[in-house]
């Protein structure tokens, strides 16, 4: 007896209907897969948002943003005076010292942009570190930037980038890593180096006809400018960080101590040892020592 054959569709249309009812509907499955995958996106995004909202992540984002902002500001400051010097709108000697003053003040004033995290000082230290790399790169001749050389050097030689300017940013790096914004020692030392030493040269070159008897490269008026500007900038920056709550200042004692620190820094700046020890090293080191003896690690 012959085996029974399965019934066949009577027409092509019935064949298509049979296939559509018996085979899996792939077209319907694919959208479901995309919907499942898409449903996971909000969950991942929510997890990332939750992690970013934690205090540690928030501080990290703040410090990273502050680093980028301060780096861009410091670079723009130097490039602005590069352009002014290149166009001969500002004298090279004046540009060098104005950059000297403004760089230190700008960097110090930017410290409150960083968080209260213990790692914040390391983010801030990235700014002088990048400047160190930049000065080494151009000072060693790997790249050439005549505008930079003219704006921050005394004689317009690239080798000078490896002396005064490099010492300056190294001291900035040390101050931010060792002392930071909650120590009057670092604040006063940076104020004396940037403001005091900077204005001593600016005023001394313009009005310093009467020289010191023991150092003909320095003048009475330049030394007076060193003392006054260093004292005033130190007092201003201590007030600034005290107002923001980083340090406590008892002005009945602090003012007298600042006078002694400014006097010590001025005496060191006057000593004829520039050929041996650069002012950007001797002045902040002397200031750190005297400030440590007088203030300790507080501004009382």
From Swiss-Prot:
InterPro entries: Phytol/farnesol_kinase. It is an enzyme of class 2 (transferase). One of its GO terms (cellular component) is chloroplast membrane. Its EC number is 2.7.1.182. Signal peptide: none annotated. The lineage of its organism: Eukaryota, Viridiplantae, Streptophyta, Embryophyta, Tracheophyta. Pathway: Cofactor biosynthesis; tocopherol biosynthesis. Involved in the activation and reutilization of phytol from chlorophyll degradation in plant metabolism, including tocopherol biosynthesis. Catalyzes the conversion of phytol to phytol monophosphate (PMP). Residues 1-36 form a transit peptide. Keywords: Chloroplast, Kinase, Membrane, Plastid, Transferase, Transit peptide, Transmembrane, Transmembrane helix. GO terms for biological process: vitamin E biosynthetic process. It comes from the Eukaryota. The chain crosses the membrane at residues 60-78, 98-118, 122-142, 168-188, 227-247, 254-274, 276-296. The keyword DNA damage does not apply. It is a multi-pass membrane protein. It catalyses: phytol + CTP = phytyl phosphate + CDP + H(+). It is found in: Plastid, Chloroplast membrane. This is Probable phytol kinase, chloroplastic. Belongs to the polyprenol kinase family. PANTHER family: DOLICHOL KINASE, PHYTOL KINASE 1, CHLOROPLASTIC. GO terms for molecular function: phytol kinase activity.
């Amino acid at each position: 007896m012959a085996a029974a054959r399965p019934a066949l569709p009577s027409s092509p249309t019935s064949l298509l209907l049979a296939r559509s009812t018996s085979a899996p509907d792939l077209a319907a499955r694919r959208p479901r897969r995309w919907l499942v995958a898409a449903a996971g996106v909000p969950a991942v995004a929510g997890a990332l948002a939750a992690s970013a909202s934690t205090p540690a992540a928030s501080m990290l984002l703040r410090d990273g943003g502050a680093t980028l902002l301060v780096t861009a500001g410091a670079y723009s400051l130097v490039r602005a005076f590069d352009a002014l010097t290149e166009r001969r709108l500002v004298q090279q000697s004046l540009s060098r010292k104005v950059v000297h003053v403004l760089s230190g003040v700008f960097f110090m004033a930017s410290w409150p942009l960083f968080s209260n995290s213990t790692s914040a000082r390391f983010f801030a230290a990235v700014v002088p570190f990048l400047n160190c790399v930049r000065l080494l790169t151009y000072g060693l001749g790997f790249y050439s930037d005549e505008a930079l050389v003219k704006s921050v050097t005394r004689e317009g030689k690239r080798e000078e980038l490896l002396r005064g300017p490099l010492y300056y940013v190294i001291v900035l790096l040390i101050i931010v890593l060792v002392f930071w914004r909650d120590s009057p020692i670092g604040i006063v030392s940076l104020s004396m180096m940037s403001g005091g030493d900077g204005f001593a040269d600016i005023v001394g070159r313009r009005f310093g006809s009467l020289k010191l008897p023991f150092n003909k490269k320095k003048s009475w008026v330049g030394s007076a400018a060193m003392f006054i500007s260093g004292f005033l900038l130190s007092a201003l920056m201590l007030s600034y960080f005290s107002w923001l709550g980083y340090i406590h200042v008892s002005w009945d004692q602090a003012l007298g101590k600042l006078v002694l620190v400014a006097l010590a820094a001025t005496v060191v700046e006057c000593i004829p040892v520039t050929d041996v020890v650069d002012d950007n090293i001797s002045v902040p080191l002397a200031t750190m020592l005297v400030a440590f003896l007088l203030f300790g690690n507080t501004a009382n």
